[in-house]
Amino acid sequence: MKSSHLVKKDLKVVWHPCTQMKDHEKIPMIPIKSGKGVWLYDYDGVKYLDAISSWWVNLFGHSNAYINRSIKNQLSQLEHVLLAGFTHEPAIDLSERLIKLTPSKITKCFFTDNGSSSIDAAMKMSYHYWQNKKKKSKVKFIALSNSYHGETLGSLSVSNIDLYKKTYENILKETIIVESPDSYNKSENISEEKHAEIMFDKMYKTIKKNHRDVCAVIVEPLIQCAGYMRMYHHKYLELLSEACREYNIHLIADEIAVGFGRTGTMFGFQQAKITPDIICLSKGITGGYMTLSTILTTDDIYDAFYDEYEKLNAFLHSHSYTANPIACSAANATLDIFKDKDVIKKNKILSAHIRKCFESLKDHPHVSDVRQKGMVLAIELIKDKKRKVSYDWKERRGIRAYLHGLKNNVLMRPLGNVLYFMPPYVI
């Protein structure tokens, strides 16, 4: 079947995510038939380099032989069983392994099915904890400006990008927003670490003022990915962790996009040597194969729900495919590869090579910044570099770059005026 025929069929029946469908009157839809390694192949035999890991999920290449075998083996045993009142080996193994990868105070694993739902569940978990502890005034959340935590009503409430949020403001929970420590906006004469310290003063004052009413602070460690790949120094996380402990507030680390080696460590928060109260994981957890997410947390939070049934203190959050055995098997295979292939160490070498490839762009008259943390590199386009005047978003410079990439067999998905490179680790 030809790609053109599939496009016609698709546009009659499929409503695509995060897309203005009218764009496809001019912008080509790309039907993909197969994938192998870092390459995707359409129905006409044209191949595309997956430079964004298919929305940041694919870690070890498409059709990875090891993950394929793990999934096939699981398919022959058990495709699914409910996790309420039942359990299975893949879920137990995955929980144990994730807990071992995190600080010693992290002891429990709760399963959800995608990134947004894990944020919703984490918010409910924190709020419900304080209710069970009779701290009834703790009902609010603090988040950073330019943050993105998902598009369900809960996760969107703690996000701060108008493009996704503004239309729905009237039905969202009000959140306290504090200015992001984003290093892009720092003064040239100070370091990123010093900038983080200066910016944290705003967060500290907000926590001090509102702590009696706040359940948790939620942040994306080190990189605000959907927030135009803006990055900040880990010093901010150190200070934030201290403040949350001082004022008895939970710290929720949204590791959905940055976890599993993206920033140079297994998890972004580890660079600050802190222990969040709640850690949300998804995207790369299954190597890019299936939807799955987890929430890792402490005995302190778990114990607040452990009670006689009649007291109605249980955490009654669930979904039908909780800890699906096939997805858990893919996740366990992914962790096997991390261990057996020494991925974190190899990524340091690979990220240094990627940095060299893009260094020359720093001097381009329409590039204001080339920034990188681990296996994430972003290029900020600008109209006037000297005056720091950005391109009007209506010019859609990112889409121009996207189309240019397709012509050169590279699949990108720019964020406004920001191009980014976030490839599988096998590139």
Please identify what each model-predicted range represents.
Residues M1-I427:
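Conserved N-terminal phosphate-binding loop of PLP-dependent enzymes in the Aspartate aminotransferase
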